[in-house]
Structures are given as structure tokens and as C-alpha cells.
Amino acid sequence: MGKEVFLLDDQGIKRALTRIAHEIIEKNKGAKDIILVGIRTRGVPLAKRLAQRIDQIEGEIVPVGMLDITLYRDDLTKDENDPIVHGSSIDSEINDKIVILVDDVLYTGRTARAALDALVDLGRPKMVQLAVLIDRGHRELPIRADYVGKNVPTSKEEIVRVSLMEIDKKDSVMLEGSKNVV
């Protein structure tokens, strides 16, 4: 068994989100027509934090929604107990808007694919972009993040553990089971 390696503290997360906010504004020529949609669970507080950063930079309030992808996952089996579905909550119209999906970790791409499926059931965005705090590689689907806080090459056995104040009472990103120091 490997050890835990510290990747980001609260200030590292804050800097990564500030940089992503600037990149979002630059790529989209401002914050007009943008909706941030957090993927449950940790994508939601990250989306809210990004919206705050964008407001601080641009002086424009960006709507934030929440997407529950439980029923869109391809790893649900028929034998499994009934999944707990929390429902999606996007108060703004997504048609003809730039929707930025926000998640904590991009790994195989299956969560992002499920989020795209869930999103198109809610409307037809002008464009969909993906922002992630950590990209750890090992894609199984042709999905790439538009905005990345930190690229962390990992082995498939390692686990990236993101803790956020709103859920876990602390902000940190750890790599568990690591045989190497990052």
C-alpha cells in the first residue's frame, strides 16, 4: 500500500479556481450568456465558487445550477438497489446559452458523458464546456476538459481525494495509494 501525497491546500484550490475563472472569461469574451452547472456532489460548490470569482472579476452574476447524473450513469446495473436520485436544479434557461459543466475530478470521462446526456434532456445549449479541478488522465471516452485546475498523472490504482469546505469541512486535494512523490 502506498502513501498519501498532498496535491493542493485551500490556497492552491483558490488559485486554481481564480485562474479557471479568468480563462472562462477570456475564452468566452466575458461572462454574458454563461451558466455554470455543477455535477453532484463536489462540482456544485466548485461551480458556486467559480461564479463568485467571475462576479469579482467581471462584476456579472453568473447563474449556477446543479446536475444529478445518477440515472444517466452507465455503471448502474439492473441488480443494484434503487439509486438515490436528488434531482437536477437549473433555474436558468439553458437554450442558446454557454453551459459550463463543473466537476472535481476528470478520470475516465464517463461522468462527463453522463452529464452531457442529462444536460441535453433539459434543453439545447449553444455550447457546452467542461471545467475540472483535477485531470488525472486514463480516459476511456474521447472527452477533454476546456479548463483544468491541475493535471495530475496517476496510476489507475491511485485515488484522487478532493475535500471541500462545504461538504467535508476542509479544502484539500490528496493522492492516495501513491508510490511516488508528486
UniProtKB/Swiss-Prot annotation:
CDD domains: PRTases_typeI. It is an enzyme of class 2 (transferase). GO terms for biological process: DNA-templated transcription termination. The keyword Oxidoreductase does not apply. Coiled coil: none annotated. Keywords: Glycosyltransferase, RNA-binding, Transcription, Transcription regulation, Transcription termination, Transferase. A motif (PRPP-binding) lies at residues 99-111. Its EC number is 2.4.2.9. GO terms for molecular function: RNA binding; uracil phosphoribosyltransferase activity. The keyword Iron does not apply. InterPro entries: PRibTrfase_dom (IPR000836), PRTase-like (IPR029057), PyrR (IPR023050), PyrR_bifunctional (IPR050137). It catalyses: UMP + diphosphate = 5-phospho-alpha-D-ribose 1-diphosphate + uracil. Homodimer and homohexamer; in equilibrium. Regulates transcriptional attenuation of the pyrimidine nucleotide (pyr) operon by binding in a uridine-dependent manner to specific sites on pyr mRNA. This disrupts an antiterminator hairpin in the RNA and favors formation of a downstream transcription terminator, leading to a reduced expression of downstream genes. Belongs to the purine/pyrimidine phosphoribosyltransferase family. PyrR subfamily. This is Bifunctional protein PyrR.
